């Protein structure tokens, strides 16, 4: 059950307090050994608090914030009654609620290499996708009571906005440095900060030493191959990541039909090592490009930053890349 269970929080109502409670509910379920969790974006029942539904800008804001949170759960899923939920029912491109939703949908798709590889760690090693902070920072007592922040995988700290506000305070765990996903600003851990949160921004902080693979912008998961992934290196510590791939839509991985590519970052030497590919499966890419980005205040920021530090060809053999 642990490897495949997908739970949801039930037919909850559209309410800011309910949105806040979704975070701790997800983390509690993850701690019981069920790694995949989701909720109805915007709440299932909206008529009580928002009788006008998608005609009400107040519902738009709650829905957008809920979608931002859902982007970093086991399944990103919109579902409900009383009012339509399709993105085009909120307006057109150029309207803030439409644009903020499109931004999160694109981000979810672009993070699929990271999410899919993390899911393999769940299957093969029993890891979790939504991680309570004390699981990874047991020596930091400040995280013991934090129920509104979490790690998504081992690298991305998520601090959802759960009220009608344009800023929120959050705590960055001690023992590492953190890099703002959107701006590249570096913060020392072990402190509370205040982050501005315009309606299209959810606070995201990446742990120093992380390697995050970023895929193409797509309309569905398998629309484009992963033959030119961006690899974002967040400096400040050593780190590693294993990219997992398989045939996408069957159980052949249970028969060993998959591949892994281990990547390691040596921060002192500023060296990325992409190790030999392990495994094989039908349709596996024999060669590909990696666009490697050393994240700083300009490069590797947010969703659409396509700049890169160096471009390499990879054919399954070990390569070392020295970065400035």
Which residues does each predicted region cover?
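Catalytic-domain carbohydrate-binding cleft regions of carbohydrate-active enzymes
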Residues: 3-201, 206-207
């Amino acid at each position: 059950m642990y490897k495949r269970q997908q739970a949801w929080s039930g037919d909850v109502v559209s309410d800011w307090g309910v949105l806040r409670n979704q975070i701790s509910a997800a983390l509690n379920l993850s701690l019981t050994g069920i790694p995949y969790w989701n909720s109805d974006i915007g709440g299932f029942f909206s008529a009580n608090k928002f009788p006008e539904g998608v005609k009400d800008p107040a519902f738009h804001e709650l829905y957008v914030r809920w979608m931002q949170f859902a982007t970093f759960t086991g399944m990103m899923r919109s579902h409900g009654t009383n009012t339509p939920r399709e993105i085009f029912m909120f307006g057109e491109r150029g309207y803030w609620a439409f644009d903020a939703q499109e931004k999160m949908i694109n981000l979810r798709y672009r993070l699929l290499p990271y999410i899919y590889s993390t899911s393999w760690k769940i299957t093969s090693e029993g890891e979790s996708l939504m991680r309570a902070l004390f699981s990874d920072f047991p020596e930091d007592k400040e995280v013991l009571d934090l129920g509104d922040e979490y790690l998504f995988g081992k690298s991305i700290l998520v601090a959802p906005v759960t009220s009608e506000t344009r800023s929120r305070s959050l705590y960055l765990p001690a023992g590492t440095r953190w890099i703002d996903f959107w701006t590249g600003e570096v913060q020392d851990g072990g402190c509370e900060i205040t982050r501005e949160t315009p309606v299209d921004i959810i606070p995201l902080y990446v742990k120093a030493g992380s390697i995050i693979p970023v895929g193409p912008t797509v309309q569905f998961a398998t629309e484009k191959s992963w033959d030119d992934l961006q690899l974002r290196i967040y400096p400040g510590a050593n780190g590693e990541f294993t990219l997992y791939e398989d045939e996408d839509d069957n159980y052949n991985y249970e028969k060993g039909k998959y591949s892994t590519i281990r990547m390691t970052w040596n921060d002192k030497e500023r060296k990325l090592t992409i190790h030999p590919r392990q495994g094989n499966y039908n349709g596996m890419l024999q060669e590909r490009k990696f666009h490697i980005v050393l994240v700083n205040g300009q490069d590797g920021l947010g969703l659409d930053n396509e700049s890169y530090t160096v471009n390499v060809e990879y054919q399954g053999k070990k390569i070392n890349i020295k970065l400035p």
